[in-house]
């Protein structure tokens, strides 16, 4: 039998290449999606990106604050996860949770797995930036709102074996409170006893909502781990995290190349996959 093969034309080759490229992209997407699902199953409230999504819910944040502050009269009116505060004159910050209650009090809640990330001067810095960003030009100092910076830490940062530490300025000579309404709190997640706070810290370590003590938190965790819409939301969050990490790596590469001083802005932009304007801005910032 004589079998004749039609010679492959240019268009046929291009179509074949496109199909192959599409298949590779689909396989890569499926691999990343499966990795995301596996990672999502292991998330706990002690993971800041997951915690930020869970506590974007006002009722969950109210519940959290009521236990930490031992108050039942607190009502949250706004809450934002992964909230950026810009500082044009210095270092900007991204807050895990920023909430405001009905009385105008401001709450910054941070999850810190590493001791370095929970150092005391970071708490001070967060507090100062919050003060600077909630005031308007010309506003009277007495109108400055009461603020709380709360660190929930994986380790006992204060090394005293206590479940919670309250830090407020005092007058050294009299021992009386200074009364500036600026509060810093460290919560030691290592203590998971039968107190309300201990049960809350137990829930922060759970990967399975069935193991959690508090229904309000378990339902929110279950939504992001098991509900189709919740899972899709978390997958988008993880994709954004990958993109942000990749961009940070490109910026770091550009900064290293600028430091070497051997390439033009255009060459650095092409190598680091940034715009020429972005490279120039990085250089000007480095000089400043």
What are these regions (language model features)?
Residues 1-183, 193-195:
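Accessory alpha/beta interaction modules
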Residues 2-41, 45, 49, 68, ...:
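Short, charged alpha-helical interaction segments and adjacent helix-coil junctions
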Residues 151-154, 188-189, 225:
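Pocket-edge structural micro-motifs
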Residues 171-180, 188-190, 200, 204-207:
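Low-complexity, glycine/alanine/valine/leucine- and proline-rich hydrophobic stretches
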């Amino acid at each position: 039998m004589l079998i004749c093969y039609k010679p492959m034309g240019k268009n046929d080759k291009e179509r074949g290449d496109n199909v192959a490229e599409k298949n590779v992209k689909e396989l890569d997407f499926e691999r990343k999606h499966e990795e995301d699902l596996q990672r999502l199953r292991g998330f706990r409230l002690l993971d800041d990106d997951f915690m930020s999504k869970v506590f974007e819910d006002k009722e969950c944040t109210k519940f959290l604050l009521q236990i930490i502050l031992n108050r039942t009269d607190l009502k949250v009116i706004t809450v934002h996860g992964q909230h950026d505060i810009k500082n044009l004159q210095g270092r900007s910050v991204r807050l895990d949770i920023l909430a405001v209650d009905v009385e105008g009090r401001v709450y910054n809640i941070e999850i810190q797995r590493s001791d370095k990330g929970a150092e005391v001067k970071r708490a001070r810095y967060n507090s100062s930036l919050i003060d600077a960003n909630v005031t308007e030009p010309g506003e009277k100092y007495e109108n400055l709102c009461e603020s709380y910076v709360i660190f929930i830490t994986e380790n006992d940062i204060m090394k005293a074996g206590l479940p919670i530490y309250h830090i407020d300025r005092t007058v050294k000579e009299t021992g009386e409170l200074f009364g500036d309404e600026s509060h810093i709190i460290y919560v030691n997640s290592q203590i998971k006893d039968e107190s309300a706070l201990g049960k809350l810290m137990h829930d922060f370590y759970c990967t399975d909502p069935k193991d959690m003590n508090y229904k309000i938190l378990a339902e929110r965790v279950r939504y992001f781990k098991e509900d189709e819409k919740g899972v899709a939301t978390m997958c988008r969050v993880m994709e954004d995290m990958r993109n942000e990490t990749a961009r940070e790596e490109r910026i770091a590469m550009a900064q290293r190349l600028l430091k070497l001083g051997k390439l033009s802005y255009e060459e650095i932009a092409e190598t680091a996959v940034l715009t020429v304007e972005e490279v120039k801005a990085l250089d000007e910032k480095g000089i400043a």
